[in-house]
Design a protein with these regions (language model features):
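Active-site-proximal beta-strand/loop segments in catalytic clefts of secreted hydrolases
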Residues: 262, 321-324
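Short, solvent-exposed loop/turn and secondary-structure capping segments
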Residues: 119, 271-272, 323
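Catalytic domains of carbohydrate-active enzymes, especially glycoside hydrolases
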Residues: 303-322
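An acidic-aromatic substrate-binding cleft motif
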Residues: 216-231, 236-302, 314
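Conserved small/polar residues in nucleotide/adenosyl-binding loops
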Residues: 326-333
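N-terminal accessory beta-strand-rich subdomains and adjacent acidic, glycine-rich linkers
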Residues: 1-248
Length: 333
């Protein structure tokens, strides 16, 4: 991938390993078709009233000949601000049900760029961001990491997507995915020696990374590129690659602003998760009616009323109280 004549991503591996089939090598090209698409559409809500969806597409049909007789399509869509690509498996006699073992997609960068990243995790994205060169990010991330107690750390050294990158020449690169439906979410393995990233799919408890049935397509892998970081934020590339809205009636969808009690327990506002200072409490065992409240749990009627009053006075549409009340005493709720 090039931007203004300069390389952004160097030649990189593609392919998927299924338990039933190796779809990473032994292919020959059956066909390659170019096309152009240009439309303007109106989202239900968003930053723009109208969105232009304009790209050049390359559809490459691949075949594993001889005894396998398998067909796979790799579809590329090139926009003014980046690239999206995905794998497609049409219906065919030699494949039906598949279990994903691994995805081999790589993103080979051109140097020791700066990353703006958080650790790859199977459960949460709630980490402080680290800014460091690829060669230094492992150590820098460990220094920056604050353990929360509910992490599910990836089994290899990974970072979360979307991943923001800045090159030494001042170019901004963003790696992410679009149209994530019936497939595992993607983290990125980090090779801090070769400055390489590769797909790391989130597994289930058995280590499986997807259960698929043909015909199918994977999510889009996306690479956005700009010499202005603001253009990455303003890009509609991922939105254009996502599936269209399937709802026939969208009249009830209205954008609104809201404030919430939940965030107070994360941002140091004084609220805590603990109803009581009794640290040995166990759900289903502890009788919370006999505990003395510490006064720091923000999800109580008096405090929520304060949020409601603040919202009303400041033109905020709603208050979100996203926390369980089941363990609070009656007079607290």
């Amino acid at each position: 991938l090039y931007y203004k004549g300069e390389p952004v991503v160097e030649p990189s591996a593609l392919g998927i390993l299924m338990e039933e089939a190796d779809l990473s090598n032994g292919f020959r090209i059956l066909d390659a078709t170019n096309s152009t698409f240009d439309e303007t559409w109106m989202p239900v809500w968003g930053e723009y009233e109208k969105v232009r969806n304009h790209y050049n597409e390359l559809t490459v049909t691949l075949s594993q000949p001889a005894k396998y007789d398998r067909t796979m399509i790799v579809r590329f869509r090139l926009f003014d601000d980046g690239l999206g690509f995905r794998y497609e498996l049409p219906e065919q006699k030699n494949m039906n049900y598949l279990t994903v073992k691994d995805e081999l997609t790589e993103f080979n960068l051109t140097g020791n760029h700066t990353l703006y990243c958080i650790p790859g995790d199977y459960d949460t994205n709630e980490f402080a961001y680290t800014t460091a060169a690829i060669s230094e990010v492992r150590e820098a991330m460990e220094r920056n990491l604050r353990k929360k107690g509910y992490e599910a750390k990836a089994t290899s050294f990974t970072v979360q997507t979307p991943l923001m990158i800045k090159t030494t020449e001042g170019l901004y690169i963003n790696i992410h995915e679009a149209a994530l439906v019936d497939y595992s979410a993607m983290l990125l393995n980090v090779d801090d020696k070769e400055f390489n990233f590769s797909a790391h799919l989130t597994p289930d408890k058995l280590g499986k990374k997807g259960y698929l049935q043909l015909p199918l397509h994977t999510p889009w892998r996306t690479i956005m590129v700009s010499d202005d970081a603001r253009s990455i934020l303003a890009s509609q590339l991922i939105l254009n690659l996502n599936e269209p809205c399937k709802l026939e009636d969208t009249s009830w969808i209205k954008p609104q602003k809201f404030i919430g009690v939940w965030w107070e327990m994360f941002t140091g506002g004084g609220g805590t998760w603990a109803y009581s200072d009794y640290y040995k409490a166990k759900p289903g065992i502890t009788d919370y009616s006999k505990l003395t409240p510490n006064g720091h749990h923000p999800a109580n009627t008096e405090h929520v009323k304060e949020y409601i009053d603040f919202a009303a006075e400041n033109g905020i549409d709603a208050v979100l109280v996203a926390v369980s009340y089941t363990h609070l005493r009656a007079h607290e709720t």
